[in-house]
Amino acid sequence: MIAVIPAIGEELIFRGVFQKIFFRLFRSGNLAIWVTAIIFSAVHLQFYGFVPRMILGLVFGYLFFWSGSLWPPVISHFVNNAVPVIWSYLEGGHKIIENSDIALWKQMIVLPLPVLASIVMLLYFRKKSIKDANSSLNQPVTSGL
């Protein structure tokens, strides 16, 4: 539940509400994504984690923008949250372990997994979005008569 509830709740709020509002306000997908990512990171209230969380917010924002669905950012957010929770459980039983308690070499192996999964989804949906845009440009225009 630690990984599920924030993934669904935060994505509904940040991508499903804020990003849509900013898109209507700015009429720019990129600006809406960046503003939402900055707010997403600021709300987490971690000074040293601001840039990494902003980058996560950008990834989640582009996943939503290019896929047209909340599910890809929810899944990516879930994986990002679940990996450290599972890791902590495996390392220390039922207690939550801080990243500083986990050997650096182990962090370097496991923690990039959610990032790689997100990048793969991001590239897939970007390619699909470009393909869909190109195919709609190549369709003949009918007069509707």
Predicted regions and their residues:
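Transmembrane alpha-helical segments in integral membrane proteins
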Residues: 1-22, 117-128
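Small-polar-interrupted transmembrane alpha-helices in polytopic inner-membrane proteins
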Residues: 2, 29-44
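Hydrophobic residues within alpha-helical transmembrane segments
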Residues: 35-39, 55, 75, 79
